[in-house]
């Protein structure tokens, strides 16, 4: 958690306990100045990141994988306003995160709640990715299976099969436009704190990936008024039962 998340969560969950009121600046200064030599550099680096990176429209990832002409792909510009304004659960953004030795994981983030799912992949070919996504979405409640926004990578060439199997509509971003999946891009930056570049992702089990996702889903977010993604999504699903 960042100092801002700690401070905001305490204000929200302990409103009557004034002794627990503490500003982000106080937390940061205490950790940084009193324990600077004891703290590992990586921890300091994470403290400095009080929020995830915001990528501008000209930002592209180094080594961006090639795009293809997706057959019968629906462009992102045809998404409904309800998806764009984050009013309902079940609209996801997704992408692949790559490691060494040709290893990959798939990441999914719900646009409204910021709830994160991380999937182990056998490969980044369209068959492997389609199977992993299909299995996961079919395990979700129907109210969480509405749409998926992805980039134009060849791993989702079988998107029509995925939609037929799950009922989830797929929208494709414009080429070289990662900001159109900004929520997913920012979440991937958080995931990289657990799985740095030059890490072989194949060494991790699905259970280990689930534990990382659970940490992210139990982390309060300023954009959610310091509620957690898990709280938001569980409350939303409960209201539809």
Label every model-predicted segment:
Residues 6, 27, 95, 108, ...:
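Mobile genetic element proteins and their domesticated derivatives, centered on retroelements
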Residues 98-101, 118-142:
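Active-site beta-loop-alpha junctions of metal-dependent nucleic acid enzymes
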Residues 114-119, 172, 197:
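Short small-residue beta-strand/loop micro-motif enriched in glycine and branched aliphatics
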Residues 150-166, 172-193, 202-214:
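RNase H-like two-metal-ion nuclease catalytic core shared by retroviral integrases
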Residues 197-241:
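C-terminal domain-tail junction helix/linker
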Residues 1-62:
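Conserved short alpha-helical interface segments
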Residues 47-106:
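Mobile-element integrase/transposase regions
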Residues 102-103, 111-116:
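Coil-to-beta-strand transition motifs
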């Amino acid at each position: 958690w960042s100092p801002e998340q700690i401070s905001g969560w305490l204000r929200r969950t302990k409103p009557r306990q004034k002794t627990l009121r503490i500003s982000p600046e106080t937390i940061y200064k205490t950790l940084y100045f009193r324990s600077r030599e004891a703290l590992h550099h990586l921890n300091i680096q994470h403290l400095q990141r009080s929020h995830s990176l915001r990528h501008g429209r000209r930002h592209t990832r180094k080594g961006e994988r090639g795009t293809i002409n997706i057959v019968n792909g629906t462009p992102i510009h045809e998404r409904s306003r309800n998806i764009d304004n984050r009013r309902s659960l079940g609209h996801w953004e997704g992408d692949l995160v790559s490691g060494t030795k040709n290893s990959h994981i798939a990441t999914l983030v719900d646009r409204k709640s910021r709830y994160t799912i991380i999937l182990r992949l056998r490969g980044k070919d369209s068959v492997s990715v389609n199977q992993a996504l299909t299995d996961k979405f079919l395990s979700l409640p129907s109210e969480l299976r509405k749409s998926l926004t992805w980039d134009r990578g060849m791993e989702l060439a079988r998107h029509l099969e995925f939609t037929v199997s799950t009922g989830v509509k797929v929208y494709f971003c414009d080429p070289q436009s990662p900001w159109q999946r900004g929520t997913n891009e920012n979440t991937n930056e958080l995931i990289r704190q657990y799985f740095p570049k030059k890490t072989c992702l194949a060494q991790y089990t699905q259970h280990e990936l689930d534990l990382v996702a659970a940490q992210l889903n139990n982390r309060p977010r300023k954009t959610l008024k310091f509620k957690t993604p898990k709280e938001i999504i569980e409350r939303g699903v409960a209201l539809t039962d």
